[in-house]
A protein has these predicted regions:
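Positively charged n-region of N-terminal signal peptides that target proteins for export
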Residues: 1-5
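Core of compact, soluble alpha-helical bundle domains
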Residues: 23-147
Length: 147
């Protein structure tokens, strides 16, 4: 499986649970990137997330031949950019990446659980968690294939 496919499938984890919570009044002036704790905090969440996925027998087959170092770097850049940080994601679009993979809601749901677990492990606040998932949410239609 190509790295771009794996990167895209990992993003699935962020998009199913998209929420609509608003940031608190005091945090509205800071970017989501800053409220998440910057690149270091995003890197820590991604590290935990990829570990969770690797241990998840429901979906870890997607990652069997993946270069995890590259995967993590792509995920960090994607989250960093999506949250208003200075990074740039340069991978393929989610639609291109997932074409023909047959991703269904079951795999998507498993990744959501793994991502939420990683966010919770790092004590990401509910507002920030919901906002991040909401920013990434529109990608779902490009990832999950219709039956």
């Amino acid at each position: 499986m190509k790295l771009q496919h794996v990167i895209g499938i990992a993003v699935i984890g962020w998009v199913l649970a998209a929420g609509s919570s608003q940031a608190s009044d005091g945090a509205k002036h800071q970017s989501l990137y800053d409220r998440l704790g910057g690149k270091g905090a995003i890197t820590a969440v991604v590290e935990t997330f990829v570990g969770n996925v690797g241990g998840d027998k429901r979906i870890n087959g997607y990652f069997g031949s993946t270069d995890l170092t590259k995967l993590k770097a792509h995920l960090v850049n994607q989250i960093c950019e999506a949250s208003g940080g200075p990074c740039k994601y340069t991978g393929r679009t989610m639609k291109q990446t997932h074409a023909g993979m047959g991703v269904q809601d079951g795999a998507f749901g498993a990744l959501v659980e793994d991502m939420v677990s990683a966010l919770d492990h790092h004590k990401v606040g509910k507002a920030e968690k919901d906002e991040l998932l909401g920013v990434l949410g529109p990608m779902k239609s490009d990832i999950v294939e219709k039956k």
